[in-house]
């Protein structure tokens, strides 16, 4: 007996039941007779599927029901596929249908599923085998009926989007006993010719029996083995054939297939305009870089130009000469200044000048001072100056028995025997007279 803590509400119970149903029956096929057919203004389809013993409610919502190729009616025997679920508000379980066909197609549907499973197990539908569509195809082969809305829609879209593409129609039956063989033959020939960048196989909508030519095993194998990319556009969006599984690309409609095959010329023009602008900017940038590089190389070349180098050396030489001249002038000015200073000092130390000054001073002596004493002082001072003058007079030294010796060639005063060599001629100044002698012996 269930514990009271586990008591459920009706909503909880219905939710649990719904989850169990959906997990146990994710997808079911059911065959029965239609009853209670209702199609309100919303576009949804509500029916009852029944047999002699039971019935089950079914719903097909507008996105699926609008593609039905027949008119559901009371008593019609159908084959349905859907997901089992529970309508929680009433506690009723129902099937949400995604496929509904007349019951005569049931055998075809089972044959289709068996063949699809077998080919899929062989790897015929492996995504790794798929080829990408060309970005800018030049020639496209279209295998379809030469009359009808399909080829008109395809040509209209292709010419509008990319009128430069070349389109070749390979007319074929798209329904009937011989259609599959004819489509297979045209596809094989188009692929082996190597003339086409892509091949489009297209047909309008129809029942499973109408589309049965595209569930042919040989056609599916030819599509999978093709070296040319193949795009299929067969029936409506809800219709799937073996040709769709084998093709490199499956389009929901022929018009969409045409859009997938070629680029939009308006987008291409816009892209080309953008590329042109980028190219112009890039060219201008490269040109600016080249000009800048040329300017730099010109400056470097100019800096290494021998003529420029010589001019630079000449400027440096002129500057060095100017600085040397300034330096010489400065040295001469300093020497002349020092010479003037020495001359002034020597002039001031000249005994004759001092005597003249003293004599001038004597004239201005105060007559009130004792003249005799003043005169004696000045005489003593005069005698001292005379002695000082005689002391520095070289002639006085000569008078005491010495001699002044000079080189005869340059009149240089000789103070050291190292200044002369044997054979040199010397002039000797004596107290009375002068001698010219030749050196025979020289010693230190």
Curated annotation (Swiss-Prot):
It is found in: Cytoplasm. Its EC number is 3.1.11.6. It catalyses: Exonucleolytic cleavage in either 5'- to 3'- or 3'- to 5'-direction to yield nucleoside 5'-phosphates. Keywords: Cytoplasm, Exonuclease, Hydrolase, Nuclease. It comes from the Bacteria. One of its GO terms (molecular function) is exodeoxyribonuclease VII activity. GO terms for cellular component: cytoplasm; exodeoxyribonuclease VII complex. GO terms for biological process: DNA catabolic process. Disulfide bonds: none annotated. Heterooligomer composed of large and small subunits. HAMAP family: Exonuc_7_L. Bidirectionally degrades single-stranded DNA into large acid-insoluble oligonucleotides, which are then degraded further into small acid-soluble oligonucleotides. Belongs to the XseA family. This is Exodeoxyribonuclease 7 large subunit. The gene is xseA.
């Amino acid at each position: 007996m269930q514990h009271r803590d586990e008591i459920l509400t009706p909503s909880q119970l219905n939710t649990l039941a719904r989850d169990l149903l959906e997990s146990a029956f994710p997808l079911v096929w059911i065959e029965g007779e239609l009853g209670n057919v209702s199609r309100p203004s919303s576009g949804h389809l509500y029916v009852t599927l029944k047999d002699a013993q039971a019935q089950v409610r079914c719903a097909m919502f507008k996105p699926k029901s609008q593609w039905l190729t027949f008119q559901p009616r009371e008593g019609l025997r159908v084959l349905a596929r859907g997901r089992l679920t529970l309508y929680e508000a009433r506690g009723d379980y129902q099937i949400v249908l995604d496929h509904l066909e007349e019951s005569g197609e049931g055998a075809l549907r089972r044959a289709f599923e068996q063949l699809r499973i077998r080919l899929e197990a062989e790897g015929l539908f492996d995504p790794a085998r798929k080829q990408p569509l060309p970005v800018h195809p030049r020639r496209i082969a279209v295998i379809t009926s030469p009359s009808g809305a399909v080829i008109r829609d395809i040509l209209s879209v292709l010419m509008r989007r990319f009128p430069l593409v070349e389109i070749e129609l390979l007319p074929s039956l798209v329904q009937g006993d011989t259609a599959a063989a004819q489509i297979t033959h045209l596809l094989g020939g188009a692929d082996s010719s190597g003339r086409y960048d892509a091949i489009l196989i297209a047909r309008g909508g129809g029942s499973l029996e109408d589309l049965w030519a595209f569930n042919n095993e040989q056609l599916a194998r030819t599509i999978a083995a093709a070296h040319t990319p193949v795009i299929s556009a067969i029936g409506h969006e809800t219709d799937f054939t073996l040709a769709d599984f084998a093709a490199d690309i499956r389009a929901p409609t022929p018009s969409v297939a045409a859009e997938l095959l070629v680029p939009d010329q308006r987008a291409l023009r816009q892209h080309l305009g953008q590329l042109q602008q980028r190219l112009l900017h890039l060219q201008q940038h490269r040109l600016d870089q080249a000009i800048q590089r040329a300017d730099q190389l010109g400056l470097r070349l100019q800096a290494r130009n021998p003529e420029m180098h010589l001019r630079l050396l000449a400027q440096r030489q002129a500057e060095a000469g100017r600085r040397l001249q300034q330096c010489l002038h400065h040295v001469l000015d300093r020497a002349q200044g020092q010479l003037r200073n020495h001359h002034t000092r020597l002039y001031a130390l000249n005994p004759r000048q001092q005597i003249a000054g003293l004599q001038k001073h004597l004239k201005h002596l105060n007559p009130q001072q004792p003249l005799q004493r003043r005169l004696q002082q000045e005489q003593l001072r005069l005698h001292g100056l005379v002695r000082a003058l005689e002391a520095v007079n070289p002639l006085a030294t000569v008078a005491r028995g010495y001699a002044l010796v000079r080189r005869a060639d340059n009149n240089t005063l000789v103070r050291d025997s190292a200044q002369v060599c044997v054979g040199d001629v010397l002039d000797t100044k004596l107290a009375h007279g002068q001698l010219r002698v030749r050196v025979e012996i020289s010693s230190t």
